[in-house]
Amino acid sequence: MRTDATPTTTADWLGDLDLPTTTPTFKGRKTTQVRLEQRKKFVKILSSRIHYISHPRIGGLECSINLRDVCNVSPGYCALVVKHLMLLCACNPEQIFVNQWRWTVKLKNVAAMKFLSMVFADNANHPLYSLWTHWFNGTEWP
């Protein structure tokens, strides 16, 4: 766990999350708050790694996340991040594709919709937010 306030890489940020290797089974108000805070932090980290969002009229909604700096640290750590992303989206695993050669994760259709709605729920200053709102309102992209 890092002690300074400004992690320098995505791997450092993810290291601060202390991602468990299994899903926690304990319950309680404080535990739920901690999990929600870590989930928000995890989504914020991944939102800075979004590579592209496809136009949904061209064959479905897709979102690509670049995990190169995480996977260069450890492929096992990358697998753990992908596992937690799958738990976060809680969708059909067939909608999440991992490209091990480029170290990217592609979310399709429902998985992309769930992830992007989590990203943009609290982050109106994200560079892709205007595209998301145009698509969500049914207007053409700028």
UniProtKB/Swiss-Prot annotation:
Alphabetized InterPro entries for the sequence: DUF5844
Superkingdom field: Viruses
Pfam families noted in UniProt: DUF5844
Family, similarity comment: Belongs to the IIV-6 115R family.
Protein name: Uncharacterized protein 031R
Organism expressing this protein natively: Invertebrate iridescent virus 3
